[in-house]
Amino acid sequence: MNNLSIKKKLTFFTTLAGVSLGAMHIANRVLEYISTADKLINSDEYEYYNWRFGKIAYKKTGEGSPLLLVHNLNVCSSSYEWRNNIAELAKSHTVYTIDLLGCGCSDRPGLTYTNYLYVELITNFIKHIIGEKTDVIVSGESCPFVLMACANDETIINKVIMINPPNLVDLAKIPTKRSKFIKNILYSPILGTFIYNMYVNKKTIAHALCSSYYTQNEISEKDILTYFEAAHKEHTNSKYLFACQKTRYTNANVLHCLNKLNNSISIIVGKSNPENSLAASEYQNYLPSIEIAGMAKTKQLPHIEKCDEFIENVEIFLSDAEECE
């Protein structure tokens, strides 16, 4: 009797698990379809660099000294982040915009994403596609690996302008045993995708954008939908990057490289978020030569909210660096 009862319970729970996974799978497919239905991101508009870990989408615009724009390392982000800046910068520079591995129109392989992976990507992209020493403007969570690329190979990057770099204390945190367990769950085919979809959907993206803007009424429906689509292209395989970021695999302690950098480095911060200025000051404490420019009434995306003022700051920093050479 007891054996029969156990068998019934096992059958019930097995059936329940199967039904639950089936429901999750259907929900995943529906959200993937909804997120990409508008086709706002056209992969045919890009050129592609066949890197050893996957195809990297990029665009080349304008003429003049090379300038590489690196978007924030985030599953929702892409070179779309620079939409308000490219035309003006291209008047005096050859502007390269790149979609990082795991983002935008670039490939999203199921590997472990680390800071060093992106150091290698930036290094190889500059050497193989740009072909000469370049200036770099980099946003948010991508700032650390650009600094590490500078320290790793002094022949590839000239001047660096960072936009709201992350604070150094958080960057130094490393994965734990619990982190590895969470990463494995998020990498699982159905459950991992379902959890990713709970965290990265239209509502959560709209909320994140609202907290990133000082003037929230400037956020358009198209912006939200574009970020939503970017996060779910290629069968939602951005979940691999998401998992690695959430579990600190993309973190790296950059303190060891700051003191040996000879590059001209500047930081532009959105002053309406006090944490941005504090983080910038941390970098300046370790490397006093860093210049900081604050932009009032902006938060995480000053280059989008006040693009004219942003361009003015960029040209000042780039011209100042040229005079020092």
Region spans (language model):
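Conserved HGGG/HGGXW glycine-rich cap/lid loop of the alpha/beta-hydrolase fold
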Residues: 59-105
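Short glycine-enriched nucleophile-adjacent loop
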Residues: 143-154, 160
